[in-house]
Amino acid sequence: IRAKGNRLAELRDTLLGTLKPGFRELYPVRFPWLNSTQETAVNKVLCARDVSIVHGPPGTGKTTTLVEAIYETLHREPQVMVCAQSNTAVDWICEKLVDRGVPVLRIGNPTRVNDKMLSFTYERRFENHPAYPELWGIRKSIREMGGRMRRGSYEEREGMRSRMSRLRDRATELEIQINADLFDSARVIASTLVSSNHRLLNGRRFPTLFIDEAAQAL
């Protein structure tokens, strides 16, 4: 990663071990439903300024610890991003958060999302938005006018072009509105690491990123 004198450079050097990670001094939070090791790990995550790594043998509750850290972080931050190497891992975390009432927006191919999380995918939420029927109607009108333009006179075609231009502008406004509503209402944006490069996430910034199965991505 070619970066110098910025936050990306700091994170790169921290992950490579050439820069010591920073931690805040916070009063420990108690989690009676976790064991002492898990509780310590969650608090370490909450204190991290740069990066915190939770590691351990299989079956020790690392993902459970991660879910708790995410939930607690949402008491401090308006929105976080959650990623994992596999769709199964992303869905498992999302299910646990949804069960706690956390609004989740799942980014990725809906055909690879489990049935329980399907209603939380971007595509399904987009189609269920109150403004979607108007957008669908506009798109239908544009398609129909496109078909009629080939048969109309010059004056009719010019009139339809003008109307289609206005409809396209309105469609763009609705798409922007729906996207803003979906992202603004979600507390957790979730995707696989591959899908985190999705165009919908271009330009978006998150105070904290959680990655499950991080070692599998190396």
Label for each model-derived stretch:
Residues 40-41, 53, 65, 92:
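Acidic, Ser/Thr-rich intrinsically disordered and amphipathic helical segments
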Residues 1-43, 99, 117-140, 144:
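Pre-ATPase regulatory/linker segments immediately N-terminal to the P-loop/RecA-like helicase/translocase core
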Residues 33-34, 42-51, 73-76:
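Phosphate-binding P-loop
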Residues 49-69:
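Walker A/P-loop
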Residues 61, 217-218:
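Catalytic P-loop NTPase motifs of RecA-like helicase/translocase cores
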